[in-house]
UniProtKB/Swiss-Prot annotation:
Catalyzes the formation of a C-F bond by combining S-adenosyl-L-methionine (SAM) and fluoride to generate 5'-fluoro-5'-deoxyadenosine (5'-FDA) and L-methionine. Can also catalyze the hydrolysis of SAM into adenosine and L-methionine, and halogenation of SAM with chloride to generate 5'-chloro-5'-deoxyadenosine (5'-CIDA) and L-methionine. In vitro, in the presence of L-methionine, can catalyze the two-step conversion of the non-native substrate 5'-CIDA into 5'-FDA, via the intermediate SAM. This is Fluorinase. It comes from Streptomyces sp. Its EC number is 2.5.1.63, 3.13.2.3, 2.5.1.94. Keywords: Hydrolase, S-adenosyl-L-methionine, Transferase. The keyword Endoplasmic reticulum does not apply. Homohexamer; dimers of trimer. The gene is flA1.
Amino acid sequence: MAANGSQRPIIAFMSDLGTTDDSVAQCKGLMHSICPGVTVVDVCHSMTPWDVEEGARYIVDLPRFFPEGTVFATTTYPATGTTTRSVAVRIRQAAKGGARGQWAGSGDGFERADGSYIYIAPNNGLLTTVLEEHGYIEAYEVTSTKVIPANPEPTFYSREMVAIPSAHLAAGFPLAEVGRRLDDSEIVRFHRPAVEISGEALSGVVTAIDHPFGNIWTNIHRTDLEKAGIGQGKHLKIILDDVLPFEAPLTPTFADAGAIGNIAFYLNSRGYLSLARNAASLAYPYNLKAGLKVRVEAR
């Protein structure tokens, strides 16, 4: 029986391996060999190599879109070949949905049962946002030679310590038998900057540049704006890195900004405050990067 309780096991695969050689194909070939009939969905293989925080952003919302029991094989492994092992966790999708309840109860066909999913990843912080947004039921260090090679290739732990065991788990191998159970303190996490709210002003950071469009994503969520009394139509001043100000109303779409090139403030598909130019790049002309400070003021 597959991990999702059906005859069609699913692995969603994210990595930094790229698609210019056969690395991803090797991983997927092993997945199909170990778990015949598996459906392997490519999430992304072009993330910035070794960027754990970027990878974490790509995997946190996945349970909203996949059937219960899906195995998420997620990897960027800068410490390949070292004592850094993989961790396998069972998470339960939040009752209000994987992205703070955006679609909960909407009846639009996207809401899933409050069921469990398995993530497997290097224990290097990649699961930070997953664990914070969803919580988890149980976590294990992946060490059993029933699911990983006895002598793993030291330069390719993404294959040996993530792809291979993900296939065994998708095929129904018991999660509790992949290795010893981990205490919460043993799961590596990175620091996530907090959003500060003072009246109708908020402070946060740029979390990502939305390639290839050049839009700017922040860590300020819809719920943070609501706490500050800010909603659609509110005119805002947003200052980046203390020196670069932009002004516009918060609107649902880019087109609401008007002419091409006009500034648009909007909530991205993940529910976070973002900045853009209508049909043009905002980030690239200024060479803006993740990590910049963001200040939002209602006007």
